[in-house]
């Protein structure tokens, strides 16, 4: 099921020549969100050798651009070291980073009331470290993202108003002008489609307009999977599909989910153009979990399973590649620290490969074709979930209950 866009008659540009402008929208350089945590706590950091295993797997899938989220921990430094080591081992190895700097409001993650129009003192440290790393590894880091879903108002524990993101974007753009940061590094913020003006008018403020003008491109997020619960206008079976075989019902539902994501993308483009701006818009994050015991599972919207997840992946890759849009798919590997107290929570199950080194359905064909031959994760070869039994997989695929008008 995995769509791999192998370069055809195209010489891969060497790292020093490669820029964000050349990377983004280039189907020879597929993108993904990456976290290498194996344990249920980020206190246990992935080692350089573990990260190198991950990088070899991703490279085999023709994924060459990774998105990270913060510089709090050793993970990003170890990731940069791992890439550097692999480049020394193989001069043709390529991997680039969209480096995230985490942004919080004042009092975020404390017992105090969050103050959304003031910022955490930690933000300055994040930005300073992002600059240091970018200057140290300019051949790897090609993009800096200021904040992750840092402006969306449902992030009640930490979101900031757009002026705070704008402050740091302008700071980084000024460093480029002062030759204190590589001029070809692109600066953005990676946020929900609503935060970029694609939804309600309460987001349409002048600071957002100035931010859109200040970034080098827009990195927007779209999650139809979450909206199968929160805004399920697209989710369900149409009246004229009720007699379809179950697989066709699911396929039709997933096509509508993909189209819902496209509509959110287009809503951001539309708002951007409405304020007189025309610059690239790429997908900084989208994904579809394979398990959930919450809103999205069998007791909820019946959205999460390996078949639907694989289909969403393929549909999004097909559309984004066709339109030269980079899609940083969420995510490469399952990480169970995200909802450590609830092992079946959806946040733990967005990866293409699980923590048992098993390729989910989306990658079964890659197992068959030998993509992972000789590669291991945590010492284990990459095998298939469900022992490759598609009938067993389909026992976990449920059809949405909702009936939609034709």
Feature locations, PLM:
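Substrate-binding cleft of extracellular glycoside hydrolase catalytic domains
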Residues: 78-185, 283
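Boundary/entry segment of secreted carbohydrate-active catalytic domains
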Residues: 8-54
């Amino acid at each position: 099921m995995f769509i791999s866009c192998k370069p055809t008659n195209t010489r891969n540009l060497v790292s020093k020549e490669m820029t964000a402008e050349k990377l983004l929208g280039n189907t020879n350089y597929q993108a993904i969100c990456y976290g290498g945590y194996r344990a249920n706590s980020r206190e246990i950091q992935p080692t350089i050798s573990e990260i190198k295993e991950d990088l070899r797997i991703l490279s085999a899938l023709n994924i060459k651009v990774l998105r990270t989220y913060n510089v709090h921990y050793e993970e990003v430094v170890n990731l940069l070291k791992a890439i550097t080591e692999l480049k020394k081992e193989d001069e043709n190895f390529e991997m680039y980073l969209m480096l995230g700097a985490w942004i919080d409001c004042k009092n975020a993650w404390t017992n105090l009331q969050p103050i959304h129009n003031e910022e955490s003192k930690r933000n300055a440290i994040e930005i300073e470290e992002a600059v240091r790393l970018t200057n140290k590894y300019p051949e790897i880091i090609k993009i800096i993202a200021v904040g992750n879903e840092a402006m969306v108002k449902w992030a009640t524990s930490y979101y900031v108003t757009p002026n705070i993101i704008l402050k740091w974007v302008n700071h980084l753009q000024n460093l480029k002008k002062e030759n204190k940061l590589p001029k070809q590094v692109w600066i953005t913020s990676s946020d929900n489609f609503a935060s970029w003006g694609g939804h309600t008018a309460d987001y349409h403020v002048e600071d957002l307009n100035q931010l859109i003008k200040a970034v080098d491109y827009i990195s927007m997020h779209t999650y139809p999977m979450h909206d199968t619960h929160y805004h399920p206008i697209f989710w369900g079976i149409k009246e004229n599909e009720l007699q379809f075989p179950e697989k066709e019902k699911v396929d039709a539902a997933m096509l509508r989910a993909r189209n819902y994501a496209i509509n959110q993308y287009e809503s951001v483009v539309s708002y951007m153009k409405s304020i007189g701006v025309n610059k690239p818009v790429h997908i900084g994050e989208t994904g579809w979990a394979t398990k959930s015991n919450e809103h999205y599972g069998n007791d909820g919207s019946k959205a999460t399973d390996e078949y639907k997840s694989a289909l969403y992946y393929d549909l999004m890759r097909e559309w984004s590649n066709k339109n030269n849009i980079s899609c940083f798919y969420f995510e490469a590997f399952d990480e169970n620290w995200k909802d450590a107290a609830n092992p079946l929570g959806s946040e733990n199950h967005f990866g293409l490969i699980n923590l048992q080194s098993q390729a989910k359905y989306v990658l079964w064909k890659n197992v068959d074709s030998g993509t992972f031959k000789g590669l291991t994760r945590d010492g284990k070869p990459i095998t298939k979930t469900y022992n490759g039994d598609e009938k067993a997989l389909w026992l976990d695929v449920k059809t949405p209950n909702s009936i939609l008008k034709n």
